[in-house]
Amino acid sequence: MSAFTPASEVLLRHSDDFEQSRILFAGDLQDDLPARFECAASRAHTQQFHHWQVLSRQMGDNVRFSLVAQASDVADCDTLIYYWPKNKPEAQFQLMNILSLMPSGVDVFVVGENRSGVRSAEPMLADYAPLNKVDSARRCGLYHGRLEKQPQFSLESCWAEYNIDGLTIKTLPGVFSRDGLDVGSQLLLSTLTPHTKGKVLDVGCGAGVLSAALASHSPKVRLTLCDVSAPAVEASRATLAANGLEGEVFASNVFSEVKGRFDMIISNPPFHDGMQTSLDAAQTLIRGAVRHLNSGGELRIVANAFLPYPKILDETFGFHEVIAQTGRFKVYRTVMTRQAKK
């Protein structure tokens, strides 16, 4: 997070205007500008654990990771700077939550890349904080308004669910494949055989669909689920509860908070971080799996066929095999042996 994103560079063009502001930064915080911005005071709220990890080193208790912001997160703030994510329902969830806590009259700034759909901020906030575009640069837009009316926010109304093979999948805005099972996960699920046993770690668990499906036909598995996303963590907990299943669920930046070893690690790893393409999480997953697999333990992941995971798997484990594939996706399997690079 050392280099500033285009959105942050647009904000820096107006840095003189914020010298006396007490700012809450929120949204898709892809760099450490909230910690370095020159202003009277700054706080940050994020739903992304890896963003919190970076910012907390510099901001301490002035940055919080959670599903929803609380009144203490906005205390004394007179300005909101919101970084627009690529997911519109996620933006609505976060903005309605935060603005419901802020007093009328606060300044509201929304910044984001044009390709992310930041223009949607204008109609979204029209009834609460009418926005005007104040800058356009680096293929980004910067919008400003003042909060005229607090929105009503209800976390309960944000929940959605769908069903797969008799399982209820609970989900929230910002969770991967919120509207139904994605093709990649479906392919990975097709390879999970009944009566699997042992300790299974689901990395990047999303709404918990992989773990729920596995546990439904393999009741002897012991599940551990983790994700960087606060909505995903809460959705996975709700999915397990809705289906009478048990498992430990927590926030983790891949393996950062994971303890111990497992008999199987499963994942549909992301290759985007916000709007940016990034293979960091998948590479960390593959290379770090050797420290979290028992001898003979298995790593099984699904990925877009064009991604360069076979090379990383072979470098780390010495081999891999493709156990299922379509035109777009492949399911890779490898096993912890003596030749794996620990």
Swiss-Prot record:
Catalysis: reaction(s): guanosine(1207) in 16S rRNA + S-adenosyl-L-methionine = N(2)-methylguanosine(1207) in 16S rRNA + S-adenosyl-L-homocysteine + H(+)
Subunit structure: Monomer.
Record family assignment: Belongs to the methyltransferase superfamily. RsmC family.
Domain of life: Bacteria
Gene Ontology annotations for the cellular component aspect, listed alphabetically: cytoplasm
Native source species: Salmonella gallinarum (strain 287/91 / NCTC 13346)
GO molecular function, one term: 16S rRNA (guanine(1207)-N(2))-methyltransferase activity
Keyword tags: Cytoplasm, Methyltransferase, rRNA processing, S-adenosyl-L-methionine, Transferase
S-adenosyl-L-methionine in keyword set: yes
Cellular localisation: Cytoplasm
InterPro entries to which the protein is assigned, alphabetical: DNA_methylase_N6_adenine_CS, Mtase_sm_N, rRNA_ssu_MeTfrase_C, RsmC/RlmG, SAM-dependent_MTases_sf, Small_mtfrase_dom
Pfam families assigned: MTS (PF05175), MTS_N (PF08468)
Record Gene3D superfamilies: Vaccinia Virus protein VP39
Top-level EC class: transferase
EC numbers: 2.1.1.172
Function as written in the Swiss-Prot or TrEMBL entry: Specifically methylates the guanine in position 1207 of 16S rRNA in the 30S particle.
Plastid is among the record's keywords: no
SUPFAM superfamilies: S-adenosyl-L-methionine-dependent methyltransferases
Protein name (record): Ribosomal RNA small subunit methyltransferase C
PANTHER family: RIBOSOMAL RNA SMALL SUBUNIT METHYLTRANSFERASE C
